[in-house]
Amino acid sequence: MMSHAVCRLLMAVSVVLFGQATRAAEPPAARPQLPLRLAAPVRPKQLPLSPPSPPFRYTEATHGAGSLKYVGEIPVFTLQGTPEQIGEQTAVLAKEVLPPLLETPKRIIQQFGLNYDLLRPIATAAATSMIGHSPERFRAEMDSLAKYTNADASLLYVANSLTELRRIGGCSAFLVTPDRTATGEMMFGRNFDFPTFGVLDRYSCVMIVRPEGKHAFASIAVPGLTGVISGMNDAGLALATLDVYASRDGSSMFDMNGAPLALTYRQMLEECETVEEARALLEKTPRTTWMNLACCDRNRAVIFEITPKKVGVRDPEGDILRCTNHFMLPDLAVGVRCERFKTLGHLVDFKAGEKFTLEEVHRCMHSVHQSELTFQTMIFEPASLKVHVAFGPGPCTQKPLQVIELADRFAGK
């Protein structure tokens, strides 16, 4: 248990990070809405940007039961076995990128003018405490990764636990239920909008993870992120997290007595098959902060509106579900001013009940990109176990999507 003084100091730090980012994230002035096409973007938030990253290509390799291969321009890791084996495979296959990636928490803290050396021991103590609320296997995987990277494991604890402190992301999600898609199956579009700090866009990848005795899943991430921020498992359960900046329920913005949400989301993919099972796990796990979680299985789509106090469930508006960076449920919402949310609504109106193709979902995601911040975009198809992805310097929504067929990969074929 951490001392009250340490808790107060960490909370003060979180308020500094949260306050600056919230001011940066004020929505832009209203602009005319555009029809469903490759439209000009909504003006991006005034968030801290990063210089363009130079091109990078991973070295294809195998290690034990793990491998790193390319599908088109997309690097795909396959990791399997025990937590220790998965950690070792990640460390060896991603050895050239882990050192700069592990510097990212430091860069984020310094971005706000804070003293990293002063805060690191506090952040490490908090992260270690929070990880104690998650399954032990996740810490074992991080410890193994650190061992074979010759890195300090505390860097991984912080990277996977204290992302809840930052509020510098945007992100958008657009889910179309089977009755409104041309294919008759769920489609789940998602943009990940975040400053790249010169590394996140360069090293983005698809990670196919086959944990011993658990559901296999795909995570769209970077090496070293043991938790999940965007992913889908072999049962067709898909999810993606989106920052939230305010809540009406009186809950604290940050509760250190919760489990890191990214690790909880991974646990959901490893242990759950349906939205209802995911909800049950989320409700029984202590939560750290405010967050939206877009989630669907093959038949149902919801937004979990998460606070340390409760888990709200928002259902589709008709056959469509849109989500950005605010709550919508009456007991949680604190005003809706996001232009991206409004743009997605206008695009739905423009379709006037017609069915969406995959290309049109892609165009919807392009219509709400945030310029340099949008360095990952994807569309999940849970029924056919496919993910269509594009990475790279933003806006990556203007790039063609590469399909990754997941069924055989999940089965180890």
Residue ranges with predicted function:
Residues 1-5:
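N-terminal secretory signal peptides that target proteins for export/translocation
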Residues 145-189:
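Gly/Pro-rich turn-and-neighbor structural signature
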Residues 7-8, 128:
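Alpha-helical interaction segments
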Residues 8-18:
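Bacterial N-terminal signal peptides
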Residues 27-148, 178-187, 191-413:
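C-terminal, well-structured catalytic/ligand-binding subdomain of enzymes
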